[in-house]
A protein has these predicted regions:
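Metal-dependent polysaccharide deacetylase catalytic core of the NodB/CE4 family, i.e.
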Residues: 1-134, 163
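C-terminal active-site subregion of NodB/CE4 polysaccharide deacetylases
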Residues: 97-198
């Protein structure tokens, strides 16, 4: 790839050979493969029957789902071997701050059930839509969503915040590391080219 070729030519480009962090959801599969039993396996025993009509209308039964899972698992292993880190972006690309506690728990359980076995798990969660679990002061000790995600093994929490160049926060009990990130996506690149942002 372009990045791997560049790093090979410039080994001082990254610290200890580190690459980037790729955050994946799960509801639509991973790495281009339809790996979600919930949506693509009509024999899924944990499918929520209230969504059956929507599922029939929007998705198809993936008869190759096990082969797709194996291929996605190979990609994750190869990326990690090269130095990439894989993070959770939530299973359903949810609004984590405004979602109910129950929804956050269900979504986290689904990521653990459908994605973690393919990517090997992670301790990083990158929130969708720039939302966060709490205000800038830090995660409150009684924040149920934080406590649940912490129980799931997450130690690193990242939102989207380009209000300043960078910022980090370490929990009062050193129980989490929180940081802002800049979304390097098509929208951000377009805004930079059009001089709307830095």
């Amino acid at each position: 790839t372009i990045l791997e070729d560049f790093i090979e030519a410039h080994p001082d480009f990254s610290y200890r050979g580190a690459r980037g962090t790729i955050a994946v959801t799960g509801y639509n599969g991973i790495f281009g493969y339809r790996t979600s039993d919930y949506w693509y396996n009509w024999n899924c025993e944990y499918f929520d029957q209230q969504n059956a009509e929507e599922r029939q209308r929007m998705y198809y039964n993936n008869e190759n789902i096990e082969a797709d899972k194996a291929a996605a698992k190979e990609i994750a292993a190869a990326m990690k071997e090269l130095g990439w880190t894989i993070a959770s972006h939530s299973w359903g690309h949810i609004y984590i701050g405004s979602s109910s506690y129950g929804r956050v728990c269900w979504d986290s359980d689904m990521w653990e059930r459908e994605v973690a076995p393919l990517v090997g798990g992670t301790d990083i969660i990158i929130f969708a839509f720039g939302e966060d679990l709490d205000g800038w002061q830090g995660y409150a000790a009684d924040n149920e969503k934080f406590l649940y995600l912490k129980q799931k093994g997450f130690d690193y929490y990242c939102n989207v915040d380009a209000s300043s160049e960078h910022w980090i926060q370490i929990g009062a009990n050193k129980d989490y590391f929180r940081q802002a990130r800049r979304n390097l996506d098509g929208t951000r690149m377009w805004e930079a080219v059009m001089s709307y942002t830095d």
